[in-house]
C-alpha cells in the first residue's frame, strides 16, 4: 500500500467571517490614523525647516506639569511618555485578545507571525550592531526593529487595497507581536535607573483597576484616576511610562465571566475598550507624538548626507530596508520548509517579500527608542530621526513597487473572496471554510 501523503496547511489561512470583519475594521481605522500620522510628520518637518524653526523648538521645550510629582515635563516629553501610553494601552488590549481569543492562542497558527516577527527584530538588530562595531552608538541597536502598522496600512490604502485577507491578517498579527517585543525591549533595555518603592506603589492602583474591570465596571470617573496613578508611579520608578499603558491593557478581560453570561453573551470588555480607544490612539495620540518627535532640521542635501554618514544612521537605514525584510522572509521560509506549509492558490513568495519590505516602515516606536537610546534633542538623535524617515520612505517605495506588480492578481483574489452567490451577506469562501481547511500541522 502507498503511503498517505502528508497533510499540508496554508501559511496565511483565512479566518472566520466575524474575525475577518473585525480585522477589516481595525485596518480601516489604522489606515486613517496613518494618513493623519503622515500629515503630522510633514507639518513637523516643514515647520522645523522653515524660517520659523526656532518657534518649533521653543514649543517642544515648553514645560508644564506639577514639579512636586516630578511631572514638570516638556511638551515633547508629555507626547512621548503620556500620549504614547494610550497607544500602548490599545496595544496591550490587542495583544491580550490575540493570546486569549485570537490567532496567537493556537501555537500552531501563531508560529508563522511570531517567528516572522522575531526574525524581523533579530536581523535588523544584528545588522545595526555589525555596522556599529567598535563605535559609540551601540545603544541604538533596537531602533530598526519596529514596524509602524499605521504607516504601513496607509501605504496599503494607496497601493494595495485589494490585498487578500490572509496577507492582511498576517501583517496585522506580525505587527502585534512586534509591539510586544518592542515593549519588552523598552522595559528591560532602556530603564536607566530603577526606584523600587514607586514601582511597588504602582501595583496598588493597578490592582484596583484590575478588580474593577474584572467586574465589568466601565465608569471612567473611577478607572481614569486609577490609570493616571499607575502611570505616574511607573514614571517615577524610572521604567518608561508607556509600560504602564501595556499593563493596564493586560488587566482588561477579553472574555465575559460566568456572572456576565460567559463568552456566548457577547464580546468582553477588552473589545469594548479597544473600540473606544483605538480612534483616540490612531487619530490623536500617535499623530501628535509624530508632530513633536519628527520635526528635525535637515539643512538640505548637505545636511542629509552628513546625517546619513553617521554609522548609527546608516545602521538604522540598513536595518529597516534590508534587515527587516530579510529577517521576516528567512523566518517565514524556514517555517514553510520545516512544516511543509504552502502558500494559498494565486500567491507567491513575491507577495511575502512585498509585506516583509512594507514591515520595514518603522516610525513611531523607532523614534521613541531613538530618543531613549541617545537622548531627545541630541545631535545623534536628530541623525537617527533622519535615518528613520529615510529608511521608512525607502521601504514604502520598494513595497509599493513589489505590491503594484501583483495588484491585478490581488484584484482577482479579492473578487473570489467577496463573492456571495446566495446573497446572505456572508461571502461564500467563509461559509465553506470549515469544510475545506485542513487542520494545521496534523
Curated annotation (Swiss-Prot):
Residues 423-442 are annotated as: Disordered. It catalyses: Na(+)(in) + 2 H(+)(out) = Na(+)(out) + 2 H(+)(in). Gene3D superfamilies: Na+/H+ antiporter like domain. Keywords: Antiport, Cell membrane, Ion transport, Membrane, Sodium, Sodium transport, Transmembrane, Transmembrane helix, Transport. It comes from the Bacteria. The keyword Transmembrane applies. GO terms for molecular function: sodium:proton antiporter activity. One of its GO terms (cellular component) is plasma membrane. Coiled coil: none annotated. The chain crosses the membrane at residues 32-52, 73-93, 111-131, 139-159, 170-190, 193-213, 234-254, 284-304, 316-336, 352-372, 383-403. Disulfide bonds: none annotated. GO terms for biological process: regulation of pH. Belongs to the NhaA Na(+)/H(+) (TC 2.A.33) antiporter family. This is Na(+)/H(+) antiporter NhaA. It comes from Frankia casuarinae (strain DSM 45818 / CECT 9043 / HFP020203 / CcI3).
Amino acid at each position: 500500500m502507498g503511503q498517505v501523503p502528508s497533510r499540508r496547511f496554508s501559511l496565511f489561512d483565512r479566518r472566520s467571517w466575524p474575525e475577518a470583519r473585525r480585522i477589516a475594521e481595525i485596518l480601516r481605522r489604522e489606515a486613517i490614523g496613518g494618513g493623519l500620522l503622515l500629515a503630522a510628520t510633514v507639518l513637523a518637518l516643514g515647520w522645523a525647516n522653515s524660517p520659523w524653526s526656532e518657534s518649533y523648538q521653543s514649543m517642544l521645550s515648553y514645560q508644564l506639569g506639577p514639579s512636586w510629582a516630578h511631572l514638570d515635563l516638556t511638551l515633547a516629553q508629555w507626547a512621548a511618555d503620556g500620549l504614547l501610553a494610550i497607544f500602548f494601552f490599545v496595544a496591550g488590549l490587542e495583544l491580550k485578545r490575540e493570546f486569549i481569543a485570537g490567532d496567537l492562542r493556537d501555537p500552531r497558527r501563531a508560529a508563522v507571525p511570531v517567528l516572522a516577527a522575531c526574525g524581523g527584530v533579530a536581523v535588523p538588530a544584528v545588522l545595526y550592531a555589525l555596522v556599529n562595531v567598535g563605535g559609540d552608538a551601540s545603544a541604538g541597536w533596537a531602533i530598526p526593529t519596529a514596524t509602524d502598522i499605521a504607516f504601513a496600512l496607509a501605504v496599503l490604502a494607496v497601493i494595495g487595497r485589494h490585498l487578500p485577507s490572509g496577507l492582511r491578517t498576517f501583517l496585522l498579527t506580525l505587527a502585534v507581536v512586534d509591539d510586544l517585543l518592542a515593549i519588552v525591549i523598552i522595559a528591560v533595555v532602556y530603564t536607566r535607573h530603577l526606584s523600587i518603592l514607586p514601582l511597588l506603589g504602582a501595583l496598588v492602583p493597578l490592582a484596583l483597576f484590575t478588580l474593577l474591570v474584572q467586574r465589568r465596571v466601565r465608569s471612567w470617573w473611577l478607572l481614569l484616576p486609577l490609570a493616571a496613578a499607575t502611570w505616574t508611579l511607573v514614571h517615577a520608578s524610572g521604567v518608561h511610562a508607556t509600560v504602564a499603558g501595556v499593563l493596564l491593557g493586560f488587566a482588561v478581560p477579553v472574555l465575559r465571566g460566568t456572572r456576565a453570561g460567559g463568552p456566548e453573551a457577547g464580546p468582553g470588555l477588552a473589545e469594548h475598550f479597544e473600540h473606544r480607544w483605538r480612534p483616540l490612539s490612531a487619530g490623536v495620540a500617535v499623530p501628535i507624538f509624530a508632530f513633536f518627535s519628527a520635526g528635525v532640521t535637515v539643512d538640505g542635501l548637505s545636511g542629509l548626507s552628513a546625517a546619513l554618514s553617521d554609522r548609527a544612521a546608516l545602521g538604522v537605514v540598513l536595518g529597516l530596508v534590508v534587515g527587516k525584510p530579510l529577517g521576516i522572509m528567512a523566518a517565514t521560509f524556514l517555517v514553510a520548509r520545516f512544516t511543509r506549509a504552502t502558500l494559498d492558490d494565486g500567491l507567491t513568495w513575491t507577495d511575502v517579500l512585498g509585506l516583509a519590505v512594507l514591515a520595514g516602515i518603522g516610525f513611531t516606536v523607532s523614534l521613541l527608542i531613538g530618543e531613549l537610546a541617545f537622548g531627545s534633542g541630541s545631535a545623534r538623535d536628530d541623525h537617527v530621526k533622519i535615518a528613520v524617515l529615510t529608511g521608512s520612505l525607502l521601504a514604502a517605495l520598494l513595497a509599493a513597487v513589489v505590491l503594484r506588480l501583483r495588484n491585478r492578481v490581488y484584484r482577482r483574489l479579492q473578487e473570489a473572496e467577496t463573492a456571495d452567490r446566495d446573497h446572505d451577506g456572508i461571502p461564500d469562501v467563509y461559509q465553506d471554510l470549515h469544510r475545506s481547511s485542513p487542520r494545521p500541522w496534523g
